[in-house]
Amino acid sequence: MKHADLKQNFEVTGKSARDFIRWAAEKGVKVHDATISRHLSGKQGITEPWALAYLYFFSDF
């Protein structure tokens, strides 16, 4: 997953970074705003575990 794909997923679904943070917290995972910002800007690559988490979040399982 590239940062452009991530941006598009947020736009298409109407979900926000805050929604992702709340969703992760419900699963017992702490996520920082800065991490998502770096992913969205392309300053930090999106590793496979992050990509899976984002895909799971956007898929609404």
Task: Go through the PLM ranges and name each one.
Residues E26-G45:
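Recognition helix of helix-turn-helix/homeodomain-like DNA-binding domains
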